[in-house]
């Protein structure tokens, strides 16, 4: 029997590869000769660096950068040496979880550290980038990131504007005269699963501003400032299009990448499936195993396990999913390519017990074993 596992991380419990190897253990208890290919899975958000580094023989780098509030933070990112590709999660340098509730204010939070991570990767020889832009604490239109890469956003006196969304209102000139030259050699695949434009009722300020600490007055101001910034950019940079789907992602980071770098915005799961060449492994498999920490109706809306299932169904493969918890509305996943799904929990336990790494791996192996017994 040939089996491919591609399981998303169980957040706070198991990494993608740990879940896959636990499933492989369960399979081998039943069929010691089974050929099991354990592949990484992520959706472009949390866990993407970890999954791609572990699954693609990459290495982890740590760099001290400017955090969202201007304080130094250590950001972890990955490098896949074979393709000189850097894998970066924006949340590691400008994440909402790095800002305490009482300090959340997008007027002050900056993406400067994201640019510093990119610059560090460039200095280490990377020219391809996979960047996940979820979980941000910012609404600065990506200006901070671009400043770190050498773009200058100047006020009427010729000085760099202040960090955070508050600086947007003072931008009078944008120049690329000091951009690091290697940036022109770089290509970015930006994991973006939202379609919001930069401004307006569906723009980043209105939709995501409140969770970042914005008041109604701030939202109105930031939306106007981002609009003016976009208009200024359009006069100097022909790719600027604030209405393009996804430009409002991560407080305008989508707009920054599309306008000022050689970037494409793509579904996170599609990037991961492509980069890991999962389809090549699925073609020869008898069975595909996927899953995530919690399966529900949202899973069927295009989350990582369904991305795997769609790829598997393209080749007529059977797909089974395993999850830490399964909600009743998860049956929608059956219509999205997952033939059957199973919860891993063995009984009534506390959440803390269920999420312990050793328990989670054991539960995965035990449940997979029993399902495989039915198929042998």
Regions inferred by a protein language model and the residue ranges of each:
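N-terminal loops that bind phosphate or other acidic moieties
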Residues: 1-133, 137-376
